[in-house]
Amino acid sequence: MEKVPMTSAGFAALGEELKKRQSEDRPRIIEHIAEARSHGDLSENAEYHAAKEEQSHNEGRIAELEDKLARADIIDISKLSGDTIKFGATVTLVDEDTEKKAVWQIVGEVEADAKKGRISITSPLARALIGKKKGSTVEVNAPGGAKAYEITKVEWR
């Protein structure tokens, strides 16, 4: 069983989603199925089929969450330090072409969310950053072409 690296915050968030799906969503969906079933003929009952589809989706996500939580390798970022970039680091970069600054935290695949400034450890940018230090320059082959970034800060938060 392959371990899935994740932060303690990511583990907690997945646990909360699992709890909600099991204790709130599952009973609500079962109620919808029972209500739709009471309307008679199931072969032409759109409400019933929609509720069954929702149940299938929810149960699939529950199984996925249980699997990820069971395989979690929780990494406590508060205990990490140093100036070398690794899993959990929050890195400030400056694009060498545009001088635009960006801040990214390197997290597990299940936690990655670009809108929240979190990139997967398996992403091209994270792979280029791992092992580097403040002051280094990294080149990343992005969909829009090669980009160069200077690492201006490495933090652990």
UniProtKB/Swiss-Prot annotation:
GO biological process: DNA-templated transcription elongation; regulation of DNA-templated transcription elongation
Biased composition (Basic and acidic residues): 16-60
Membrane among keywords: no
Gene3D superfamilies: Transcription elongation factor, GreA/GreB, C-terminal domain, Transcription elongation factor, GreA/GreB, N-terminal domain
Annotated region (Disordered), positions in chain: 1-60
Coiled-coil ranges from the UniProt annotation: 46-73
Keyword Transcription annotated: yes
Keywords for this protein: Coiled coil, DNA-binding, Transcription, Transcription regulation
GO MF annotations, alphabetized: DNA binding; RNA polymerase binding
PROSITE patterns: GREAB_1 (PS00829)
Pfam family, one: GreA_GreB_N
Family to which the UniProt record says this protein belongs: Belongs to the GreA/GreB family.
HAMAP family reported for this sequence: GreA_GreB
Task of the protein: Necessary for efficient RNA polymerase transcription elongation past template-encoded arresting sites. The arresting sites in DNA have the property of trapping a certain fraction of elongating RNA polymerases that pass through, resulting in locked ternary complexes. Cleavage of the nascent transcript by cleavage factors such as GreA or GreB allows the resumption of elongation from the new 3'terminus. GreA releases sequences of 2 to 3 nucleotides.
Listed name of the protein: Transcription elongation factor GreA
Gene name as annotated: greA
